Amino acid sequence: MTIILKPGEVTLSELEAIYFNGEISKLHHDTHLVIERGAQRIAEIVAGSEPVYGINTGFGKLASIKIDADKVTVLQRNLILSHCCGVGDPLAENIVRLIMSLKLISLGRGASGVRLELVNLLENMLEKGVIPVIPEKGSVGASGDLAPLAHMAAVMMGEGEAFFQNIRMSGALALEKAGLSPIILEAKEGLALINGTQTSTALALAGLFRAYRALCGGLLAGALTTDATMGSTAPFHPDIHILRGHYGQIAVSKTLEKLVEDSEIRAAHLRGDERVQDPYCIRCQPQVMGACFDILLAAAKTLIIEANAVTDNPLILRNGEVVSGGNFHAEPVAFAADQIALALCEIGSISQRRIALMVDPAVSYGLPAFLAHNAGLNSGFMIAEVTAAALMSENKQMAYPASVDSTPTSANQEDHVSMACHGARRLLVMSENLFTLIGIETLIATQGIEYRAPLKTSTLLQSVMECLRKNIASLKEDRYLAPDLHQVHILVREGHLLSVLPETIFPSLSFQ
């Protein structure tokens, strides 16, 4: 399936399909005229004598140096090669595809002045699977994601490296094998390719999509734990949350209420339970997870605006005027990434507390210590709980806001930067940790519910448990647990456990 991108109207679901499903993307044909109009305006400037930043001048601190018309192609080539300073491991293919798609959207607005030929090459690279090797580190998220995007642009010139059919090779060879020809960049085209927030935005979007999946997984795990510990569902009553009024809290309380509906375990202790209230990790799930959902929604709103934005500099306005500005500064993306990091941290924090509740016989309401059969001889989930604590702590350290850590660059010309790129990139690590943490809770809670037999959990939760047990057996006696943790990580990360439930049971991230 090919996703047709209409700049200004691209949706979260379209970008999610590119990220998760590897869908090919290309611009709507309606963009061609405005792209060509912008390119014509750049050609007029090059033919004239007036110096215009980025078109016939140097860059950054060297912006005052005028470049002759016969040197503009050399200028653009030198710009790309000199900016290929990324370090670290290559970004994953789905991230790079998202970066390239976001760059298409920005160029498709016609304010960057590139030729249609350049846009076509980018589209063809996506279609044929020429994936530039983009090192993960090197951007401070202002004046655009210069280094990572330069590595993308280098392949378009026949330089750098790319993956083709899962083999790493030179950019020139990758283009040749795909039946494509490198492009000679004309005036401003190199700058248009690297001046933008597409790397930071792609990473933040990936973090958002993964955080939402973790939120849903956390709600599911929390519902399982509520039944495993014979917790009260009264705190999920909708009127409680309507009285407070927060959208996210109301939405997730409905999810939790539906997940535990018709549970025999819950019905068995509606009366005669000496506990008056549950610990906060059970009772305050709607408040905590609702707040997490709210900030994910706020981040989503920022990121979909940014995904449809022109973040180049200078820009060609509708009247043909070329104006320098600062749309390349990724502060909105940095803030969104910091918000997502908070949600990832808190989803994990409350999950870890629920794990601790279940493994402690003093507070688990009848569950054996560490959910172990013949405790003492067997240790059960004792160290799985420690692993969860380690992952929670690691995420807490990474939740420190990246956006507050500006430093001057480029001889103090670019003296305030966003740090959006690594602020967004850490979300991938945090979400990986969180998928495992939620998986550990899901494993323990499932075993806890099995201890409540012959009482059954809800119909929905029973279907989730059946899916889990098709992949991971119940822990009857101690065994090598690492494969179980790896398997449950995959089940949570890939959304397999969520897939057995009605899609409508979870609140939607889409607001469009």
Swiss-Prot record:
The gene is hutH. It comes from Bartonella tribocorum (strain CIP 105476 / IBS 506). Belongs to the PAL/histidase family. Keywords: Cytoplasm, Histidine metabolism, Lyase. One of its GO terms (molecular function) is histidine ammonia-lyase activity. Its EC number is 4.3.1.3. Contains an active site 4-methylidene-imidazol-5-one (MIO), which is formed autocatalytically by cyclization and dehydration of residues Ala-Ser-Gly. PANTHER family: HISTIDINE AMMONIA-LYASE. It catalyses: L-histidine = trans-urocanate + NH4(+). GO terms for biological process: L-histidine catabolic process to glutamate and formamide; L-histidine catabolic process to glutamate and formate. Transmembrane segments: none annotated. Pathway: Amino-acid degradation; L-histidine degradation into L-glutamate; N-formimidoyl-L-glutamate from L-histidine: step 1/3. There is a cross-link at residues 142-144 (5-imidazolinone (Ala-Gly)). This is Histidine ammonia-lyase. Disulfide bonds: none annotated.
